């Protein structure tokens, strides 16, 4: 099956979050199953074509009469990079700079989507599925119906629109419609109008043939007023077309048996390397090397969506239980300063690294005993799956993909982590204390670790579910 996969970011070339990871891994997994997958994404200003090994493409691609240059990264699922010197090439930030969105994001991502839809005709492709991701590609289903209805390259193509995070909706003033080349008739409540603004997210939800999101629990949550970000009525109307398909992880990049970022390697049957990773991590971040001290890790955005307010409130009680904490992340300046201050005040208990370091993220996953993810909401989440694979026991809130991937320990021989429901510091503390009690029981703890490491969270499983959905749309 030929699939056109469109995303505003694709790891490792561009990434701000889970969307980039999905767009970098799912197309490859689909290609490994025998599908012909082509990925389309912008050539952001942060991407150096020469350093990335991109090749220029000779093509007659045009968007609204304007010629468009293309680059390609060859591979099992080739990635085509759409060039536009002003809209993309001159920008370092993918969506904004200095904490502010680019003011022309509507024009930028309408251009990307139009370029993606024009690409099959320019390259001689005949995709049966157009897989469009998040608000940035939300205009795609409408554009397919109204601007490509007679395009032979897209004849019979069906659309899948994936919601990675419903909270980000691509909202713009209605006055941008003429600049986008859209008729005023789309600005209706049953189309793209959303509280007197134009919503790219709503466009995708209203016009795509099938909707997916990144975990079964999140698919249920967004049907409710509490989780639906004011789009729950539309989503309930389309509930039969909505599918929750759990994300996977790259089990080659995240493999404790051969991860190049680690000082030692380990497997479920031989865990000595994990103890070595813990000691090395403690030395690296300046904590006392203590095998007996539970080491809790966090790799996170410092934002309330991630529950960082709960961690900050619970931190004094955690430290009173002789817990060491290592945090890697950036975000809200107030939380950056709060954790930097905690590290200064408790240098033997807290280590805070503000920013991001890919290697250190791997070493935290390998060296920590516990991993804290108390998210307010979490469409899928990846770090809890990395933790399971690395024998690090997750403590998570029972929302979204966290509820789908972490089974609560039953006190005997079932479970892979510890879950809690209420969004309060006390609930986080209670779950963490349960984990600490089991940590003292080496036999029970090893069982938790081994069960987590045995979980299959590969992209192969997720790709099979997407492929099955595609075939129901385009038999």
Swiss-Prot record:
Pfam assignment, any one: Glycos_transf_1
Protein's pathway: Glycan biosynthesis; glycogen biosynthesis
Catalytic activity: [(1->4)-alpha-D-glucosyl](n) + ADP-alpha-D-glucose = [(1->4)-alpha-D-glucosyl](n+1) + ADP + H(+)
Enzyme class, broadest EC rank: transferase
EC id: 2.4.1.21
GO biological process: glycogen biosynthetic process
GO CC annotation terms, alphabetical: cytosol
CDD domains named among the record's database cross-references: GT5_Glycogen_synthase_DULL1-like
GO MF, one example: alpha-1,4-glucan glucosyltransferase (ADP-glucose donor) activity
Matching InterPro entries: Glyco_trans_1 (IPR001296), GS/SS (IPR011835), Starch_synth_cat_dom (IPR013534)
Protein family: Belongs to the glycosyltransferase 1 family. Bacterial/plant glycogen synthase subfamily.
Function per UniProt: Synthesizes alpha-1,4-glucan chains using ADP-glucose.
Protein name: Glycogen synthase
Gene transcribed to yield this protein: glgA
């Amino acid at each position: 099956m030929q699939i056109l996969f469109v995303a505003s970011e694709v790891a490792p070339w561009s990434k701000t979050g889970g969307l980039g990871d999905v767009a970098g891994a799912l197309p490859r997994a689909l290609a490994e199953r025998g599908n012909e997958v082509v990925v389309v994404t912008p050539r952001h200003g942060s991407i150096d074509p020469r350093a990335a090994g991109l090749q220029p493409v000779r093509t007659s691609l045009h968007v609204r009469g304007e010629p468009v240059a293309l680059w390609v990264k060859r591979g099992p699922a080739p990635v085509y990079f759409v060039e536009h010197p002003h809209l993309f090439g001159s920008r370092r930030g993918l969506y904004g700079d200095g904490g502010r969105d680019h003011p022309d994001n509507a024009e930028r991502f309408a251009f990307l989507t139009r370029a993606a839809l024009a690409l099959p005709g320019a390259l001689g492709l005949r995709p049966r599925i157009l897989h469009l991701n998040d608000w940035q590609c939300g205009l795609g289903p409408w554009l397919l119906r109204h601007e490509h209805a007679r395009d032979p390259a897209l004849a019979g193509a069906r659309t899948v629109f994936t919601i990675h995070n419903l909270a980000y909706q691509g909202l713009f003033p209605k006055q941008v419609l003429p600049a986008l080349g859209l008729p005023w008739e789309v600005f209706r409540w049953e189309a793209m109008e959303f509280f007197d603004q134009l919503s790219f997210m709503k466009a995708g939800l209203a016009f795509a043939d099938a909707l997916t999101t990144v975990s079964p629990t999140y698919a249920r949550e967004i049907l409710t007023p509490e989780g639906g970000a004011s789009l729950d009525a539309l989503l309930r109307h389309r509930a039969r077309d909505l599918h929750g398909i759990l994300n996977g992880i790259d089990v080659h990049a995240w493999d404790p048996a051969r991860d190049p970022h680690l000082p030692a390697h380990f497997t479920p049957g031989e865990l000595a390397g994990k103890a070595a990773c813990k000691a090395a991590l403690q030395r690296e971040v300046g904590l006392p090397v203590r095998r007996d001290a539970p080491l809790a890790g966090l790799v996170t955005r410092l934002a309330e969506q991630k529950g960082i307010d709960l961690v900050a409130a619970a931190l004094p009680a955690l430290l009173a239980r002789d817990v060491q904490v290592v945090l890697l992340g950036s975000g809200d300046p107030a939380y950056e300063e709060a954790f930097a201050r905690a590290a200064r005040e408790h240098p033997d208990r807290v280590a805070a690294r503000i920013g991001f370091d890919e290697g250190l993220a791997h070493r935290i996953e390998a060296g920590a005993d516990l991993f804290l993810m108390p998210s307010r909401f979490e469409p899928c989440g990846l770090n809890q799956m990395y933790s399971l694979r690395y024998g690090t026991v997750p403590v998570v809130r029972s929302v979204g993909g966290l509820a789908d991937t972490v089974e609560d320990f039953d006190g005997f021989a079932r479970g892979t982590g510890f879950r809690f429901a209420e969004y309060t510091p006390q609930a986080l503390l209670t779950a963490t204390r349960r984990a600490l009690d089991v940590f003292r029981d080496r036999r029970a703890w090893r069982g938790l670790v081994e069960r987590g490491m045995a979980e299959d969270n590969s992209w192969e499983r997720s790709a099979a579910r997407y492929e099955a959905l595609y075939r129901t749309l385009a038999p």
